[in-house]
């Protein structure tokens, strides 16, 4: 049976939101080493004060060189990441299909770019872990996109595709090494994240309590109570 998240190192990408704080609390309370990453130094300081065990790192996750430098720094410190919670993103929309501007799309696309950068930079470590867990927060809009949110739904769909490709990569690595799957990539879908921060944190932390093969390449919808 899985041993849970205790003793694991988990990176929260885009950690300075309320969801990031909730995840940091849940992970630290469960015995994980938390690495909270974001761009806002003041908010990272506040998170560090609220969750004293957490390590923070200021990094522009949309800049590949910065993410590579962060990964190199952690490796030099002897840190191997066992999990990633991807929280980089936001909402822009409205105005029907004609109102889906390039400016809004580019702003939203940063979430996908950050996901690509972070998972590539830490991929080898995730494969080496005996219990890697990764998750993204997507949207129910992927299953039912609306004209006024087409940009948003398109980016979230791309993020889901990337997360599912990670799942296939984990499964392939296990086959190639002739061993059981020990890593999992999961998509959490929400209609709106506000009010579900604690639930998301608990669901993510709980991924280490499940067998990797049972949850890899799954889509989990989180609904309001």
Regions found by a protein language model. Give the residues of each.
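Catalytic loop of short-chain dehydrogenase/reductase
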Residues: 96-99, 105-116, 127-179, 189-192
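C-terminal helical subdomain
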Residues: 175-225
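Conserved glycine-rich Rossmann-like NAD(P)H-binding loop of the short-chain dehydrogenase/reductase
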Residues: 30-46
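Conserved glycine-rich cofactor-binding loop
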Residues: 16-18
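Conserved NAD(P)H cofactor-binding loop of Rossmann-fold oxidoreductase domains
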Residues: 85-94
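Conserved Rossmann-fold cofactor-binding substructure of NAD(P)-dependent oxidoreductases
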Residues: 62-77
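Flexible N-terminal pre-Rossmann segment of NAD(P)-dependent oxidoreductases
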Residues: 1-12, 212-213
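Rossmann-fold cofactor-recognition segment
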Residues: 51-65
